[in-house]
Amino acid sequence: IQDRLFTIGSSLAADPEKSKMKIPDLNTEDITLLEKEIDIMVSALPPLKSFVLPGGTLLNSHCHVARCVCRRAERLATGLSESEWVEPMVLIYLNRLSDYLFMLARHACFVRNITETPWRPRV
């Protein structure tokens, strides 16, 4: 994941028209790997019946913070794509990575027998 984030940074920082360097790229295998890992975690977890509040443990909280940062990066990259060329795989990868981080947070609670806190909206 860290290597792919550096790849994304290279892609977003470089001007493909002016760059003389070969820019690393993402490929479908990178996304497929995330999706496979998500599927493995989903198969072990109970289904969600409501939204869950972030938190529970330090690890779980870190996963949720990382997910929020990833979502923000996705929104910024999407906004950038409206005025500049952005490799489509970058947007797909960031979207799947945030899903992966959400499942990782849930999985971290599950393997430690920590009950997730459901969101109970005031209505």
Q: What does each model-found stretch correspond to?
A:
Residues 1-123:
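Phosphate/pyrophosphate-binding loop motifs in nucleotide- or prenyl diphosphate-using proteins
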